[in-house]
Amino acid sequence: MNREEQLGVLESLLFAAGDAGLSTEQLTEVMEITHIEALNLLELLSERYNGNEDRGLILLELAGTFQLATKKAHAEFLRKLVEVPSNTVLSQASLETLAIIAYRQPVTRMEVDEVRGVQTDGPIRTLVAKGLVTDKGRVDGAGRAKLYVTTSEFLDAFGLNSLDDLPKLADPEAEDPDQSEMDLFFDRFNQSKEQEEE
């Protein structure tokens, strides 16, 4: 691969990693390059993003990982994008992700990924943007992954006074408690939506 192709791969990997970001160790392993090459590529990509005011993204280094982020100058437009009327329907993926966070909080994105069996970066971004979920600190240790919890807006949206009002699991010993969590959550969500429409 030439340098431009490597930069394209790096950009794709950073995009796919989302808020979790990538360490240089991960980049060297996935891209099969040296540590110095990874740092050089990151520096080049940083110059392209951070050195160009017309670009919408920047490359950040946080807690030993690198991630793409939107520029603060565009915050007003991003806010307009995510301001959604209360009757907006969440996707199935977002609802499943929200149910997992609600029942297991505080929880990392990787833990949510494990329960769902797929990456949940997109749904989590949507939930954060809608104010239903927020990050509340980071785990100790390598990677310092964000911990996600639900917000007071989540309680309001679902007609709950507190997390204690979440539907209890019918059978915690069931073979698939994760599916039970989601089914109960969807039932509660549908009930709250029906009440809003009446």
Curated annotation (Swiss-Prot):
Residues 172-181 have a biased composition (Acidic residues). One of its GO terms (biological process) is cell division. It is found in: Cytoplasm. InterPro entries: ScpB_csome_segregation, WH-like_DNA-bd_sf, WH_DNA-bd_sf. Keywords: Cell cycle, Cell division, Chromosome partition, Cytoplasm. Pfam families: SMC_ScpB. One of its GO terms (cellular component) is cytoplasm. The keyword Transmembrane does not apply. Its main location: cytoplasm. Residues 167-198 are annotated as: Disordered. Participates in chromosomal partition during cell division. May act via the formation of a condensin-like complex containing Smc and ScpA that pull DNA away from mid-cell into both cell halves. Homodimer. Homodimerization may be required to stabilize the binding of ScpA to the Smc head domains. Component of a cohesin-like complex composed of ScpA, ScpB and the Smc homodimer, in which ScpA and ScpB bind to the head domain of Smc. The presence of the three proteins is required for the association of the complex with DNA. Belongs to the ScpB family. This is Segregation and condensation protein B. It comes from Listeria innocua serovar 6a (strain ATCC BAA-680 / CLIP 11262). The lineage of its organism: Bacteria, Bacillati, Bacillota, Bacilli, Bacillales.
